[in-house]
Amino acid sequence: MAHALFNQSAKSNSPLAKPTEAAGEARENQLFNEIRDVRRNVEINIGKACNNRCVFCIDGLPKREDRSYMPYEDMRRELKFWYDSGSRSVGFLGGEPTTYPWIVQSTAYARELGFTRIAIATNATKLRLRHFTDKLLDAGLTRVTISMHGHTAELEERLTRVPKVYAKKCEAIRYLVEKKKEGYLPDGLSVNIVLNGWNYRALPKMMRFFYDDLGLDDLRINFVRPEGYAEGDPEICPPFPKVVPYLIKAIALSERHWKRETFTFGGFPLCTLPPALRNNETLLKRYMGEYRDLSTDCSVRQEGDGFGIEQIEDGRSRFNWQDRKRFDLKNAPDACHTCSKVHLCEGVWRGYIDIHGDDEFTPV
């Protein structure tokens, strides 16, 4: 059965039409933005073992085989495959990639191959260990994105369900800020916040904490994807009308107080935003992640046939993340088919519609 997003009456060049294999390879699925990094990116999942237990984790409780680590020889082959395919940016994902036994060697091999942007997405608890962090930086790590979702110990530890994790993350961030000032991490250091029902009201305070108290200059918020532990949970996944006013306040604060810093958001359908924002291309290019994110392919361990656009080879699922969201993980309600913004908007997480329905979405 075709996904609801695939409008059978849509023309082949419509954003609602499933991409052909050639179009997927071309990755011409993003709008032009002068400040977007044009390097083609791949994110390699090292395994889903993690030392946090976030209440919104999309993996929930992974199967034992999914918690196993990717063998190092497989990692080397995968890095070589993507470099030969044209990628010059690579990110290591988990689970938690800093627990991967060969993360330093993998970083060094990526640099040896010629990757110019080498990143990890991490909860950063292990990065408080300076000798370990120094090894990663010296191996060639150029960017760190840190998952942190609260500005207080109470909030962060409630969301991650790990005691004393807040202090460890703060210690890691302060050290990474120091190293960035020394010239490390030329591709940046950021915190990624999953905006959810427990923390969205604290967004302005979180901005002040991360920018002013910890000294960061890059903050990203993503609306929660209600799968895994958060599936079907309206407390964790609030309705957009409750959250959007806090997003707008955050943008206003960024314009007034943190204009030199980077603040971006993702996961908000454009029809949920006020006209003054969604119709202002200058603001969208500055703040909307879909205008700024790298074109990203993904490689994840997979047994079986998979589904949707993913291609399975050598036990790995490979897909483009922008296409995966639009065609497999999100729905386009009926309103999307007549919306003037459909070329930019990716739709709505399927899990959100399962919780709240789609009556709130209207064409613009």
Give residue ranges: language-model regions.
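Flexible mid-to-C-terminal extensions adjoining Fe-S/redox cofactors in radical SAM and related proteins
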Residues: 2-15, 19-33, 290-364
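Conserved alpha-helical substructure of the radical SAM core
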Residues: 3-12, 16-131, 135-139, 143
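Radical SAM enzyme [4Fe-4S]-AdoMet core and its adjacent flexible, acidic
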Residues: 6-8, 154, 162-170, 174, ...
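Processing junctions and N-termini across compartments
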Residues: 44, 48-51, 265, 330-333
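Cys/His-rich zinc-coordinating "finger/knuckle" motifs
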Residues: 57, 61-64, 278, 343-346, ...
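Residues that line or immediately flank small-molecule/substrate-binding pockets and catalytic motifs
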Residues: 61, 94, 122, 148, ...
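Radical SAM/AdoMet-radical enzyme domain recognition
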Residues: 72-91, 100-224
